[in-house]
């Protein structure tokens, strides 16, 4: 009978490669045992086959399936929080309106800037010195510096950057100018390609070009397109990989994705260099709402601010690249989803068209029709349709990092942990969004409308009128993030989406033909969310719609 030997002797007799592997496995097992020991204040943990590896790979490479697993665990454990690890970093996903509100509105405990610092590295292409300008600014985004810090105004980079959007995008004067420009360009592009004869097209393909080009020119000027043949297609190649480039595998394992990003960056750099060379800062366009080189006032003032703060043209080009993702990544897919629902429901098409027509005005001098964007975005069915499509198809993980130990839902969360809340989970909560006959998982255009009685003062007659009323609370609806870190372009995005829908339903007649695959072949099923985009932005339809359209004779 052979005697058992001490473990260290057995290990030393192994080939060195086997010994190293065994030591690594034993170390991981010990680390896992220590980490995964349950304590009274530890939330349920997401199961995995290989500790620290299985969930990490799933989280980084297949966010859609990963979020499904989280949702299943939350349901099975009847809790509002689940723990897992990304590598050796603890991470938590929390749900429930109160917990979401805490995550969104606790800047002193949960840092939302670190994700933007990652974007500055992965998308903008800033160097370390440039990133450190933002990273070292701990003063926050409010007018009064955080924690009483006496940070000089010229070093308050977060506040300065946010002010650009507040002054030149949220401001009604500039947002209306952008909306008018987009609407005009979009209508022109459609009129150029379609007349009163029937044409058969792929809906997503048409909007990918017409919407994206119109929005890009409105924000960044026409020169960015003129200087870069194939620019729009290059953007959509980047759109496919933008999310995983930030959260996915290391760059050396994503060489193709990095090459796509670099190609788009070289195009935006060519645009920035040309704009600085040819724009006359002392000329009449200095304060204009739009000109062809930089485009909008926002784009021009951003380029100026970046240069004044010591950022390179390479950094400014990266800022443009990142803005393109924010500009088109939500608006085009959301519009496509909305049009898919509208085209396949004749009653909805008629209702949306009738309501949109009420936002048109006629110029008394030349008889041309124009859309009143501010009126359009406040129409009840338009707003309900917009919220419903955003609710169902935007998958965005709001991400924070714990700067101090804290407690969420009675559970301890350690300093340095990632804390996330998923719109994809919150937006499907039946208790929040469900209505009789219309479960939260299904599209219903009228979900966010209530009817109110109005009495006419003269006749005394009572009329029931529709009124927009979002079904859920803000803490249950956050497609653009929330709290002090939100998408600064969300207001223009809403305008763009609803303007595009209004133009399409009032100018054209549509007939649905069939669903198609990416190669144009017939699909045996309707589109579903493309889960590659889960966790990052709006999920595009994974199928296209082949439709026939023609311009209405009244047009």
Give, region by region, the residue ranges found by the protein language model.
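N-terminal membrane-proximal hinge/A-helix region immediately C-terminal to the signal-anchor transmembrane segment
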Residues: 2-152, 476
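Cytochrome P450
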Residues: 7-25, 86-90, 194-215, 229-230, ...
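Conserved cytochrome P450 K-helix E-x-x-R motif and the immediately C-terminal K′/meander segment
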Residues: 57-72, 363-410, 423-430, 467-468
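Cytochrome P450 catalytic-domain "roof"
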Residues: 63-88, 114-224, 228, 242-248, ...
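Cytochrome P450 catalytic core segment centered on helix I
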Residues: 237-309
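Central I-helix of cytochrome P450 enzymes
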Residues: 299-355, 420, 489, 497
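Cytochrome P450 heme-binding "Cys pocket" and the immediately downstream C-terminal segment
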Residues: 348, 473, 479, 484, ...
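Conserved cytochrome P450 K-helix/beta-meander segment immediately N-terminal to the heme-binding cysteine loop
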Residues: 422-467
